[in-house]
Amino acid sequence: MDINYERPDPYYLLNKIDKEEKNKNRGKLKIFFGYAAGVGKTYAMLRAAHYMKELGKDIVIGYIEPHARMDTMSLTKGLPQIPVKNIDYKGVILREFDVDKALLRKPEIILVDELAHTNAKSQRNKKRWKDIEELLDAGIDVYTTLNVQHIESLNDIVANITHVSVRETIPDKVFDDADKVELIDIEPDELLKRFTDGKIYRKEQVKRAFNNFFTKNNLYALREIALRRTADRVNFEIEIARLSKGQITVMATSDQILACIGTSPSSARIIRTAARMAESYHSKWIALYVDTGRSLGKADKETLNANFNLVELLGGELVTVHGENVADQIIRYAELRNTTKIVIGKNHKRTGTLLHFYAKDVVDKLMDSNSYIDVYMIPNSSYYRDHKNSILSKISIQHKGSVKDVLKAIIIMAITTDIAELFSYMGFKDVNVIMIFILGVIIVYMATKGQIMGIISSIAAVLVFNYRFTEPKNSFIVYDKSYLVTFPIMMIVAFIIGSLTNKVQKEAQDSNMREKRTQTLYIVSGKLLSAVGTSEVVSIGIKYISRLVNRNVICYLADTSNKLSTPFVYKKDKGAKEEIIMSKDENAAAYWTFLNGKESGCGTSTFYRAKGYYIPIKIKNKVLGVIGVSCPSGPLRPQKKAVVDTVTGQIAIALDREILSKEQEKSKVEIERERLRSNLLRSISHDLRSPLAGIKGAASTILENGELIDEKRKQELINGIYEDTEWLIRLIENLLSMTKFDEGNTKIKKDVELVEEVVSEAVQRSSKYFKNHKIKVSVPEDVIMVSMDGSLIEQVIINLLDNASKFSPKGSTIEIKVYEKKKDVVFEIIDEGQGISEDILPNIFDRFFTNGSKISDSRRGVGLGLAICKSIVEAHGGKIEAVNKGSGGAIFKFNIPKEL
């Protein structure tokens, strides 16, 4: 974590700018906030309204909940009121706020009681807070009231305390975004007196409410929650104001504890102390580790990881910063986070050593440079034992030179000696030769890992210089006593410069690593944003997790039955073993994480023997799946855990976006389906009426006047009944076909069919309907065989013929043309009608789409025939289209693949 203390915090600065931009032309929201009904929220709101009226403000009442307290209701007098809506709901008259009248009236300030209220179903918005959003967007200031149990994030907490579940809630963001929150607070004893006097509820409701909600313990708990929630909001506002200006001086509005930890085992004591203090003060706590860039041995790394895990276990926030001056970094970060208390270990000094007589430890420096943050010192009597073990660990493990490093050092020092010999031969003085050796030592530091080779090279450089370049040469004897000073200085200078070089090199490597990690996280964030589909989101996510932590990664997603589906796996290399999915234990760990929404596996206390580390893909308290990372060589380091957590969080957001997208699509489909149902009922009611009326009229004429009607007229009436009945049958067939396609129940039963026979059968079945038109059929002489569902293709041809007959003049010709084109068979139905308007061509195959022009048989049609044709043709893998003929009329053509 890299922090720039010299400039405003971008997060808080953006928050401030965003709020200012958002509120530029927007109304202001003021919430009168309380911990229970009866504390006086509405009373305080009405008092404030009268005060604003005295100042000359245009203020009106939008809605006030009727109260039992007469002194509250009396305050409504003298304030103009917008009439409420009276809505009849199942015989009960409901009074609702009329947002449209309020927007039309557009006062400066409006009073709307009960922010969390749920509107009646006939209202435009489901929730009253959405009505208030409309008022704010229109530039109207709003006063409203709210109880603590109606805030969404506190709903469960309040329910656990009171055993009463409140359904009417508002999002936390509505409360947090309010411009002002005024806490209305009274003592619980006074509230209980109001309650028993019947000033809050009617007498008949008092007993039931007293037994369930209005108990003294409940009211004290609710009061504390309300006070704390208000304090949290004020604290966040202070943070925005403070850090957006780059001001990092501590403003102790609430307690926050900073635990300073390191590689010492005694840091565990500091962590536990900070956690206990945070619990006592009801405050947050942060564990801070300052990475000075020094190399850590294996034991130090293990201890540090154990300390990091303890922080997570005890619920603290873990932060790592980088810097050489530990005390300075602690003070700066404490100021940045508005910390009021620092907990740090204090090392016992050994008075017998000169070093400790002059040296100041971190605690002393903190005390000297800080006068406004409390520092709590935890004695660390085991410091020297820990420090000794740390040094031994670094010498034995961290700085162990490899054979490759030894060879590098020997070669570099050999070359350095040869160059020094050359300089000496050319007459250069000893000081120049010494510089050559120092340069060689620096190169050794740069070329090898750790410091052991550099230290050995420093000693070797002094010995070689003494042996080869001082009198007597080729001997370790020194005649000139000044060299006794030169040699140690030469060795110390070489060591210091080499160490600094090594440190700079390590810092550069760390910086590059952090930069690479940040860049990768930025890339994965962009890719996840642009990913389409669950599979792509997961594939991108686990791929980049694997790259960042250099491990195999697995991802399980929840299926529709709320179980884990077949996993996605990404291996860091093709030959890597998939050990994280090979055993039942691993699956059990992943499933436990899925069910409980908590991490498990290697490095945790649950399924700790597992070979993988499992973390839930979680958003809004819903677990969408599980990410698993293989741990063949031990638990992940905290830095890598943080990376996995970050990318997993991004995956969760992307998956949630996909779920929302699918739900929106599903909602659109449902809305469209409802619209189609409405259109269908409207169309059918019109289209059934005409033929049924005709059938009824003809039948009644025959029944009542059968003997008086001549045979010819009677036959005409019977034919009319028959034709209308056939038309109704075709309509019902089309409706059934479309319903089957919608439900996915239509099965295409393909058989090899003779095209000529299918066309002939369709013409024969429909010829009696088209007596006023000539049907012409043109098929190739060669036999054409196609794999298709013959009965469905017949229905397509009949529907197209029916459509052509409706829009063609009597006596005109309708032609059916069939021909082969590449791998398809093309069917064309050509009429001599008026053609199709260019405006309706794109929609002609849509359901319930009908041409508004008058048709030949005066029947409007439901608008399903062409839609069914499209569904059938596409189910066969073909396409259907309509075009206009140049000489008048239209051509409907569709193709079917010939494959047998």
Swiss-Prot record:
Q: How does it sit in the membrane?
A: Multi-pass membrane protein
Query: Where does the UniProt annotation place the signal sequence?
Result: none
E.C. code: 2.7.13.3
Tell me a Gene Ontology molecular-function term this record carries.
Answer: ATP binding
Instruction: Say yes or no: keyword Phosphoprotein present.
Output: yes
Q: Where in the cell is it found?
A: Cell membrane
Its transmembrane ranges are 406-426, 436-456, 482-502, 522-542
Instruction: Please name the Gene3D superfamilies in this protein's record.
Output: 1.10.287.130, 3.30.450.40, Backbone structure of the membrane domain of e. Coli histidine kinase receptor kdpd, Histidine kinase-like ATPase, C-terminal domain, HUPs, P-loop containing nucleotide triphosphate hydrolases
Name the InterPro entries for this protein.
GAF-like_dom_sf (IPR029016), HATPase_C_sf (IPR036890), His_kinase_dom (IPR005467), HisK_dim/P_dom (IPR003661), HisK_dim/P_sf (IPR036097), Histidine_kinase_KdpD (IPR052023), KdpD_sf (IPR038318), KdpD_TM (IPR025201)
Residue numbers carrying Phosphohistidine:
686
Q: Which UniProt keywords apply?
A: ATP-binding, Cell membrane, Kinase, Membrane, Nucleotide-binding, Phosphoprotein, Transferase, Transmembrane, Transmembrane helix, Two-component regulatory system
CDD domains cross-referenced by the UniProt entry: HATPase, HisKA, USP_KdpD-like
Give me the reactions it catalyses.
ATP + protein L-histidine = ADP + protein N-phospho-L-histidine
User: Which family does the UniProt entry place this protein in?
Assistant: In the central section; belongs to the universal stress protein A family.
Tell me, in a sentence or two, what this protein's role is. Member of the two-component regulatory system KdpD/KdpE involved in the regulation of the kdp operon. KdpD may function as a membrane-associated protein kinase that phosphorylates KdpE in response to environmental signals.
What protein does this entry describe? Sensor protein KdpD
Species, as recorded:
Clostridium acetobutylicum (strain ATCC 824 / DSM 792 / JCM 1419 / IAM 19013 / LMG 5710 / NBRC 13948 / NRRL B-527 / VKM B-1787 / 2291 / W)
Encoding gene, per UniProt annotation: kdpD
